[in-house]
Amino acid sequence: TMDDAINVMQYFVPCPYGRQIEVADGITIKFTDIGHLLGSSSIEVWLREADVEKKLVFSGDIGNFNQPLIKDPSYTREADYVIMESTYGDRYHGKHQDYVTELTDVIQRTFDRGGNVVIPSFAVGRTQELLYYIRQIKAEDRIKNHGDFKVVVDSPLAVEATKIFNMNIDEI
């Protein structure tokens, strides 16, 4: 229930990236910024029993380099066991494209034909990145003959996520 979710928050403890924390006898953890979304991390877990220590790494999505709003990922160099999400593990993403030029071209061509641009997007991460690029396009006055244009985000979750990005600008 919502009450259960709110009540459990009293047990949350913020853990900074990069600091080893002993959470129990023989168990140490460290969070690493994985560069996927704001606040995302992988976790390294060291398990010690007698003279034997094993290192496990748990990770979800791993981010890309040179993203406009997210720091580059930090990688763990070694582990005894790795457990991770791998939705795109079988795909090569290729080189980073010039998204600003591509987006400018789409907006310009659509406006020239009298249309509106509708961009479906994930509420967290992608929407904020698109807003960043659109702001850059507007600041550089890249769209010709159409003046300033209105941008609407029609997703309550995306609006709330954008507020969180704005509140944590120092993490970008």
Specify the residue positions occupied by each region the protein language model found.
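His/Asp/Glu-rich metal-coordinating catalytic cores
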Residues: 1-129, 135-144
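Ligand-binding beta-strand-loop-alpha-helix segment within the catalytic cores
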Residues: 170-172
